[in-house]
């Protein structure tokens, strides 16, 4: 599991930062990539990374402001043009379906793979399978905006091979049956319960990716005990009133959410273009005063998520 930040700026592109898009690479877990937001030129940013459009399985949109969605039509079309055939699902607030369908229709863009568009109308679970569970809550951003909590389900423990070898069970088809938790009988009549030969499960990771938002309770709830919290930091602490007026957060407010939620790690993104050069480091300094395990994303930077 790895983050690749494709765009870390706020509102409009700048020379140093493109607008919002985050790839969550799940190559080891499911051989796929999930994308969170898709601002303009996202597909161009992808060219400079290891992200492959054909591997993008899901796109989660936080809200419908242009700096989070204007790259969608181009990416969807290019994925088809480049030979993508596997299904893709887009999740987002009401209106995302109309935006995509009109853009593709007017531009006569033909998508040759199965494309599903899911409009989120209420908080709660938006996706779940045997590996992951994705929950969402409304944030505070003036228009409908969602944050996402991605929960990796616990992974079954490893088969205790040494324990089996000690009692004379040799590698073979029996190992798989025991790994599956079956009760098996050996040739000598011994009964073995597979569950007795499986180690403790590996706890799944929790990732929280928030859209644009003021400081709000929903952010804390989504981030509770997260392994990684990705939070916007559009403004410095001295501009807290401006952040409130424009439905955004300061770096210090992001750190406060991470602290309250008992998150393990905080990554700041959505940085205003007013912070050029190294001036953005002041945002990092302010956040670390409250929450030491804070990092600030820059375009094309990757962050592995270890167990």
Swiss-Prot record:
Active site: 67
NCBIfam families: PRK00055.1-1 (NF000800), PRK00055.1-3 (NF000801), RNase_Z (TIGR02651)
Binding residue positions for Zn(2+) 2: 67-68, 212, 270
Binding site for Zn(2+) 1: 63, 65, 141, 212
Organism (species): Bacillus anthracis
Gene Ontology MF, one: 3'-tRNA processing endoribonuclease activity
Cofactor requirement: Zn(2+)
Catalytic activity, EC: 3.1.26.11
Gene3D superfamilies assigned: Ribonuclease Z/Hydroxyacylglutathione hydrolase-like
Protein name: Ribonuclease Z
Cofactor binding summary note: Binds 2 Zn(2+) ions.
SUPFAM superfamilies (alphabetical): Metallo-hydrolase/oxidoreductase
Family, similarity comment: Belongs to the RNase Z family.
Origin: domain of life: Bacteria
């Amino acid at each position: 599991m790895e983050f690749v930040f494709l765009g870390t700026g706020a509102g409009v592109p700048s020379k140093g930062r493109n607008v919002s898009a985050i790839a969550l690479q799940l190559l080891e877990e499911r051989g796929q990539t999930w994308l969170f937001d898709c601002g303009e030129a996202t597909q161009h940013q992808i060219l400079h990374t290891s992200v492959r459009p054909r591997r993008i399985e899901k796109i989660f949109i936080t809200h419908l402001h242009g700096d989070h969605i204007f790259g969608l039509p181009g990416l969807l079309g290019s994925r088809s043009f480049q030979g993508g055939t596997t299904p893709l699902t887009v999740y987002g607030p009401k209106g995302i379906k109309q935006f995509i369908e009109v853009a593709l229709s007017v531009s006569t863009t033909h998508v040759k793979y199965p494309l599903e568009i899911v409009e989120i109308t209420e908080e709660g679970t938006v996706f779940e399978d045997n590996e992951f569970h994705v929950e969402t809550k409304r944030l505070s951003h003036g228009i409908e905006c969602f944050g996402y909590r991605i929960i990796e389900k616990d992974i079954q423990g490893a088969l205790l091979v040494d324990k089996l070898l000690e009692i004379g069970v040799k590698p073979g088809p029996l190992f798989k049956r025991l790994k599956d938790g079956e009760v098996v009988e050996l040739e000598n009549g011994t009964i073995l319960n597979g569950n007795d030969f499986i180690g403790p499960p590996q706890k799944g990771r929790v990732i929280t990716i928030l859209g644009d938002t003021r400081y709000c309770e929903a952010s804390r709830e989504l981030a509770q005990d997260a392994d990684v919290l990705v939070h916007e930091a559009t403004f410095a602490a001295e501009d807290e009133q401006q952040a409130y007026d424009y439905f955004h957060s300061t770096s210090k407010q992001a750190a406060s959410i991470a602290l309250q939620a008992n998150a393990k790690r905080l990554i700041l993104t959505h940085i205003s273009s007013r912070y050029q050069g190294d001036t953005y480091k002041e945002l990092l300094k302010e956040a670390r005063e409250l929450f030491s395990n804070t990092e600030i994303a820059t375009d094309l930077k990757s962050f592995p998520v270890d167990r």
